[in-house]
Curated annotation (Swiss-Prot):
One of its GO terms (molecular function) is rRNA binding. GO terms for biological process: cytoplasmic translation. NCBIfam families: rplB_bact (TIGR01171). Residues 224-259 are annotated as: Disordered. PROSITE patterns: RIBOSOMAL_L2. This is Large ribosomal subunit protein uL2. Keywords: Ribonucleoprotein, Ribosomal protein, RNA-binding, rRNA-binding. Belongs to the universal ribosomal protein uL2 family. It comes from Persephonella marina (strain DSM 14350 / EX-H1). Gene3D superfamilies: 2.30.30.30, Nucleic acid-binding proteins, Ribosomal protein L2, domain 3. SUPFAM superfamilies: Nucleic acid-binding proteins (SSF50249), Translation proteins SH3-like domain (SSF50104). One of the primary rRNA binding proteins. Required for association of the 30S and 50S subunits to form the 70S ribosome, for tRNA binding and peptide bond formation. It has been suggested to have peptidyltransferase activity; this is somewhat controversial. Makes several contacts with the 16S rRNA in the 70S ribosome. Part of the 50S ribosomal subunit. Forms a bridge to the 30S subunit in the 70S ribosome.
Amino acid sequence: MGVRKLKPVTNGTRHAILYDFSEITKKEPEKSLTEPLKKKAGRNNQGRITVRHKGGGHKRLYRIIDFKRDKWGVPAKVAAIEYDPNRSARIALLHYADGEKRYIIWPEGLKVGDTVVAGPDAEIKVGNALPLENIPVGTFIHNIELTPGKGGQLVRAAGMSAQILGRQGDYVQVRLPSGEIRLIHKKCMATVGTVGLAEHELIKLGKAGRARWLGIRPTVRGTAMNPVDHPHGGGEGKTFGKHPVSPWGQPTKGYKTRRGAKYSDKFIIKRRGK
C-alpha cells in the first residue's frame, strides 16, 4: 500500500504521483453487490448545471456499501480488498457466517482473513462496529451515524478518523477531522479504526486528461468570464476591484455561510477551525 512517482518521461508524468494499488487483492467487483450508475454530469432533471466541474469520465458500476452495519452478532471474514471508483477509500468484501456478502469501507490495518463483527458486545478491534456508548473514550472511529439506524454519514473518506472525547448524558463528544467537536447520540453506530489509504492526500494527477478520466471538468476563474457569467467578469484588466464572491453573489474567501439558528447548533460544542 502506497504511492509511486512516475519518471519525467513526458510533461504528463513529470509531477505525477499515483497509487501503486498494492493493497488491492481482487480486481473484479462482486456482481451481486453492484448496480448500474447513470451519469448525471452535474445536471438536474431540468438539464441545468447544479454541480459545476462534473462530466465525462470512465463508465462506473456502483458498489452497494453497508454503511449501517446492522447485522449484529454474526461474524464476517474479510474475503478481499477492492478498488471503488466512486470514493477515495478502498472497500472490503465481507463473507458472513450465514453466507451473506457485504461491502464495508476498508479501515487501515484490516487484512484478508481477518474476522469482524458488529453489535454492542463486539470487541474494540479495527473493523468492528458498535454503538458509540460501547466504545471507550480516546478510540479512533469512522463511518459514524448522525441518526440511529440511518447509516454512517460522517468520516468516510480515505485516511480520515474521528476521536471520542467524552460522554454527556445521552450523547457522546466526538472530535471530527475538521476540528469540530460535536455531540452525537450514544445509540449511533460507528466503526473502530481509521479509514485506509492515508496516502490519498499525496496524489498528483499530473495532467488534465487524468482528471477528465475521473469525470472532473475544468474550473474556470470568474475573472476570465464575461459579466453575464460571473460577478468578477468583464473589464480590460485582470483585477475585478470588488470583494470576491461566488457566481451567485455570495461572499467567499473566509465568509461564514452556515445559516444562523440551525437546529443542530446545540449539538456543536466547538466549530471547525479555518
